[in-house]
Amino acid sequence: MRATDKKLKVACGANTGYLADSQWIGDKTPPTLCDVRVSPNNSVKPNIGAGELAEALNRVLPFTAKEDNRPILQCVKFAAKDGKLTLVSADGFRLAVIALDYDDGEGQALVSRDDLKGIANALKRAKRARVSFERSGDSLDGMSLILDTELIRYKWRSMDGSYPAYEELIPTEFNAFAHFDAIEAVKAVNSLKVPAFSKAYPIDLTFGNGKVVMANPDDKGQAELNADTGGEAIKVRLDGGYLVQALKVCGGMVDFKITNSYSPTLFSSNGYQLVAMPMMTSEASEQAKADREAKAKQAEAEAVTQAEAVAQAHTEAAVLADEQGDEATEDIEPVADKPRRKRKVREPVAVA
C-alpha cells in the first residue's frame, strides 16, 4: 500500500487498485479512527498481553445483542478500575464478564461490536499491545478507547449512553454446583441434538452423585457426564444452542452453579463468568409461584412480629411510666394545715 494524492494505492501481486479519499465510507460506517504506523521502529510500551486481550474479546463478543433497537447492548463495555480491565457484554438472555490485570489508570468506554470485528485476529499477530483511555472532544464525560500495537493504532469514541448495572445480575448464592470438562459436555449435548430434530432444542440438566445428567424433554434421549457435584438435586432447562456456545467459550474445566430451576445460572472458568437465563417449564413456574407465596407469608409474619414487638415496647413503656409516677407521689410528704388564728371580737364603746 502507498498513499498518493488523495488516493491509496493497493498492490497485491499483479493486481493494483486505488481507493479515493472517503470512498469506503458509507451511511453505516462507524465513526472510528484507525491510524496505520509506517515506522517499523515504532515502540509501544505494553500494559496488557495481546493474546490475552484477543481471547477476552472472543469470549464476550458472541454475547452482544444483534437487534438494532438495543444499541447499548450491541456494545462491549471496557472498564478500567482497581487494577483490572473488565470487558462486559449482554444480549438480554446472557451476560459475559471477564477481568484482566491492568494497572494503568481508570476509564470506561462502550465500543460497538461491529467496530471490534477482526480486532482479535489482529491482536493474535501483534507482539505488543497497549490499552488506554482519553477524553474525547470538548465533552466532559466523553471518552475514547485507544488500542496501540507496534503497527496499528485503533481509536474508538465511546457510544453515548449508560450500560445496565450488570453486577446485580450475577448470582452470588447457590444451592447446587458441578465441576466438569466442557469439551466432554459439548459432545454429550451434540449427541442429544440429533433426536431433537430442531434448531432450537431444550436440554434438561440434573446433577448429583458425581454425575451430570443431560436429557431431552419427554425422554427422547439422555447422556451422562462424570463431574464433581454438590448441593441439592435440582433440574434446570437450558436452550441447547446457548448451552453449547457457553461451554465452547468456557473451554477446559468449568464450574456450573444454579440456585433453583427458574433463577439465572452461572458458568465460570479462570476468571470468566457467563450468566444464562434458564427456560421456564411448568415445574419451574410452580416453584417460582410457591417461592413467591412463601416469601410473601414470611414477610407478612415478620411485619406482624415487628408490629407486636413495637406494641409490646409501647405497653411496657407506659406501665413503667405509671409505676414511676406512683413512686414519685408516695415520696412527697403531706403538708399539715396551719391552725387558723382566732380574731378578737371588739367590745362596744359607750359614748357619753
Question: Model-derived features: where do they sit?
Answer:
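Structural preference for solvent-exposed beta-strand-turn elements
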Residues: 1-352
